[in-house]
Each structure stands twice: as structure tokens, then as C-alpha cells.
Amino acid sequence: MTTISKKEKEVLRKLATELAEYASLPIHQQKADMWKCLNGLEKVKPMIWMNEIPWHELGPEVNSIETTSELCHRQEKRIRQLIYQWKYMPGDMVLEPVIVCPLVIHDTGFDVLPQLKNAEGY
């Protein structure tokens, strides 16, 4: 089971607060509406979406990860990437005020295992 330290919580909360501030800007709703129009085949300006970014080459602002647990490390890295992209190369990206968390499943091993039999009954 992953234990999140107090320092990791502080780091993630600080980054999440910054992300939420950027995501609350009205430009994101405007960009989302433009993407909907484009996907609905309406005429809008050409939209720019950048998704192939060499993150490992961009320096300490995006690559200085302060958390150590695997779950926090992934979340911090993703939030830093979103903030960096918004600050320096936003294109027509839409920041949403949500953080997607992976599903965490812990198997205790105390479950009922299926009894499998082959065609001969063994």
C-alpha cells in the first residue's frame, strides 16, 4: 500500500492549486467550444494540438520531481507537464480543473480461486 508523506501532499497540492488557477481562465471554455465546433465539422480556425513533446529535454522546471512514491511521482510529473505546456506552448490546448487518478487495486490474496477442469473432468 502506498503511503503519501506530508511533503508529497504539500507538493501535489501546490501544483494542483496552480493548475486549477490556470484551468479556471475563461479562455479554456472558449477553446473547448472551438474544439466542439471543429469536431462537429463547423468552420473554425485551424486548431493547434501539440502532443509530441520531448519532456526529458526541457530542463528542471518540468523535470525536477520532488515526490518519491510511484503514484505521487506520476501525478506530479503530469501536472508539471500540463503547467509547463500552458505557460510556454499552449497552442489550442484546454486545461480542465481535474486530475485523473489511476485505479488502485490491492489484492489481499484471500479470494475464491476458480476450479478449472478440462474436458475429461480433471
Give the label of every model feature segment.
Residues M1-Y122:
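Catalytic cores of TIM-barrel enzymes
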